[in-house]
Regions:
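Short glycine-rich anion-binding loops that position phosphate/pyrophosphate groups of nucleotides
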Residues: 102, 129-132, 157-160, 206-209
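A glycine-rich beta-strand to alpha-helix segment
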Residues: 188-219
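C-terminal helical cap/extension that packs against the catalytic core
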Residues: 25, 143-199
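Extended acidic/charged loop-beta regions that coordinate divalent cations
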Residues: 1-38, 81-84, 88
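Nucleotide phosphate-binding/pyrophosphate-handling subdomain across enzymes
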Residues: 33-151
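Structural beta-sheet core signal
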Residues: 5, 125-127, 154, 203
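Short glycine-/acidic-enriched loop or helix-start segments at secondary-structure transitions
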Residues: 15, 135-136, 163-164, 211-215
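Residue-level signal for inorganic ion chemistry
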Residues: 3, 16, 53, 57, ...
Length: 223
């Protein structure tokens, strides 16, 4: 069995090289394949994670025998997956995005991408930790990633299948986050955001935070 490896930018069978940020927030890169380099590929959506997704998809197409023109066209038409850099509001005054990131490495990569895309805007993030065990094991790493923001609102931990663990709560991140941060109850979230009127807002998490997206987007329509 032939095994192929792919990566974001680590040299292997398939990876992205010479990654550049475009003015619209998307990334252009050279796709390195085992037998060629396909230069200047630009996915249809922004974000580092989408570069890696494109590399993975292109690798499968290459194995299936697609030629360079079709590989390039497939990357250009890539529109992302649900809850990965989903734009709900994108106006000169306000930007609101939602993303599924729920692991510290994902969170850091996503926040870094947003910072690259909109370097002049104040970044407000709403993060809903997912699982008590994950929060317990990675709360320091979560806090480190969230420190890249200008302001953080933490929702209570989404338990999913787990029972509460004594002493494990969103509050344990607060002393370690290097920017203004607070815990907000879900029922108060929209009121808090309405009072803050953030210019650049991203909601993160794998729980039920996406249920608020339409309601949050509506806040900006009122401005």
């Amino acid at each position: 069995i032939r095994v192929y490896r792919y990566a974001y930018d680590t040299p292997c069978d398939f990876y992205a090289d010479r990654i550049r940020l475009e003015p619209d927030g998307r990334h252009t890169f050279d796709l390195v394949c085992p037998d060629r380099v396909i230069r200047d590929c630009t996915p249809g959506v922004p974000g580092w994670v989408n570069v890696e997704n494109c590399v993975a998809a292109a690798a499968m197409l290459w194995v299936a025998g697609f030629d360079e023109a079709k590989l390039r066209a497939a990357i250009a038409s890539f529109s992302g997956v649900k809850r990965r850099f989903d734009f709900y509001v994108n106006t000169p005054k306000h930007i609101y995005m939602d993303d599924y990131a729920h692991h510290p490495n994902e969170l850091r990569a996503a926040i870094t991408s947003v910072r690259e895309m909109f370097p002049a805007r104040k970044l407000t993030v709403v993060f809903q930790p997912h699982l008590y065990t994950r929060t317990r094991d990675f709360y320091r790493e979560f806090a480190e990633a969230l420190s890249l923001c200008d302001e953080v609102l933490l929702l209570p931990i989404y338990p999913a299948r787990e029972e509460p663990i004594e002493g494990v709560a969103s509050e344990m991140l607060l002393p370690l986050i290097g920017c203004p941060a607070r815990v907000v109850r879900k029922k108060d979230l929209t009121d808090v955001l309405k009072s803050k009127n953030p210019e650049l807002l991203v909601t993160f998490g794998a729980g039920d935070i996406d249920r608020f997206c339409t309601q949050i987007a509506g806040l900006f329509a009122e401005k």
